[in-house]
């Protein structure tokens, strides 16, 4: 809601609301006698361009791709978000999906937003080594363990590196990533990860969710990413530590 100040009789008044609003309809409530000369809106968003394309012989699929690209765009501002109407915070479960989509739809300037999110996630690592999102945070600190594994793993951090070719963030965050996967997370005698509930043990929507299977899958994908980073940084001992766990027990 934006309320304009009153003006004198007969004045021509121009006003631009500086607040960022979104929605499906704009309602104007005007005093009697006010004549509207013009109504406009100014689109704002993240500094990127729609450079990707998709085309097939099915008009529905072409329209779906176009709308999907727009949906991705409106979830970008100071950070990736779930949606601007309900959740503008940087939920990393959403960001994993969105950063991967950006490579197909948007210009390279979009890469910076994902890297910013990577730094923020790791910079908010807690004293016990655990990670949580959304970050930056002031009223939230609940870890969703499986979402954090997805974030730091193959479809999160590694996808950002692989498709962008930008490895500058890897040496900055690697030690904290290693601590999370090998101190915060533990494996049992057979080499399988021990389930962690965190503060919110969410595996998927619905019922009959096999958290054991999901934990193993996401932990494996996180180790797979870490091993690639370790080899890139010349951390041979770390890579050798990862190999028997990820490739003997989890495959």
Regions found by a protein language model. Give the residues of each.
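Conserved, well-structured interaction surfaces
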Residues: 141-142
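Extracellular Ig-like/FN3 beta-sandwich strand-entry sites
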Residues: 21-23
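Exposed aromatic-hydrophobic patches
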Residues: 14-18
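Single conserved hydrophobic/aromatic residue that forms the stacking wall/gate
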Residues: 2-13, 249
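Conserved, charged catalytic cores of large soluble enzymes
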Residues: 218-232
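Active-site acid/base region of carbohydrate-active enzymes
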Residues: 25, 33-67, 73, 80-132, ...
